[in-house]
Amino acid sequence: VTDSQWGFQYSTYVYYNEHCIVFNGVHTPMKIERATFVKLFDFVKLFPHYFLGSNADLPIVGGSILSHDHFQGGHYTFAMAKAPIEQKFEMEGFEDVEAGIVKWPMSVLRTRSKNPDRLIDLGEKVLRAWRSYTDEDAFIYAETDGEPHNTITPIARKKDGMYELDLTLRNNITTVSYTHLRAHETSAHL
């Protein structure tokens, strides 16, 4: 993966078929960036029957070990991967990429192309736009007091000869009204 050393192991939790964890061989903090999309597709090219995804890189919405770069995947098709496109759209400069909003309870964009490099480029564009997006009426803030709140949970797969990249838009703002959404004091999990 990206011409570097990575570890591969099957999870002891076995949440689904061939549930695997892929670890960076170098201790590197987890971060969602362009290189993340490159790594996901490098893996999917090697194992086209697997999906590979990353948890979000922010506390609360990440629910993961943020201190070490890793991914999870497997030989499984989740319900979200089967969910239909609710609304198709086109992005300027990416007219060759199929894109749409997934009919799902979270905000998920699905992009499809025979060329994974186009999905990497588009994924980076969406990530940059979402990281800086604020909508006060919807209580979405890109940051407060210098703390970032917007990130993406990406999932890559190959399906019917096409590469897909699902981008779940995440925001980790919590309020006193929704204390049940706060992370445990001793854990990054909900």
How does the language model describe each region?
Residues 11-26, 105:
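Residues forming anionic-ligand binding surfaces in small-molecule and nucleic-acid pockets
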Residues 179-186:
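Conserved small/polar residues in nucleotide/adenosyl-binding loops
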Residues 1-3:
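Low-complexity, highly charged intrinsically disordered N-terminal segments
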Residues 27-52:
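Helical scaffold of the NTase/Pol beta-like nucleotidyltransferase catalytic core
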Residues 50-63, 139-154:
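A short glycine-rich, hydrophobically flanked beta-strand micro-motif that places a catalytic Asp/Glu
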Residues 48-64, 73-127, 131-134:
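Catalytic or ion-translocation cores adjacent to nucleophile or general acid/base/metal-coordination motifs
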Residues 18-19, 24, 61-78, 168:
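Histidine-centered divalent-metal-coordination microenvironment in nucleic-acid enzymes
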Residues 129-132, 136, 147-160, 168-173:
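C-terminal functional module detector
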